[in-house]
Swiss-Prot record:
Pfam family name, one: Chi-conotoxin
Proline amide modification, residue list: P62
Compartments, as annotated in UniProt: Secreted
Proregion residues excised on maturation: 23-50
GO CC terms in record: extracellular region
InterPro entries: T-conotoxin (IPR031565)
Protein name as catalogued: Conotoxin Vi5.1b
Amino acid sequence: MLCVPVFIILFIIIPFAPTSESQPKTKEEVAKASVHDNAERTLQRLWNQSHCCPIDLQCCPPG
């Protein structure tokens, strides 16, 4: 009787297993990921620059 909750949890978790992540990506998927990473990096840099200290410029990241 104690095994029933374990089996229920396993049946819930199994469909979310990362099987698609283990497959190799196509060139198109890699290009999309690269563009997304570049955009994310640019947004992060702009966010960091917009929150600089106006008085003490040493707290601002270079670039």
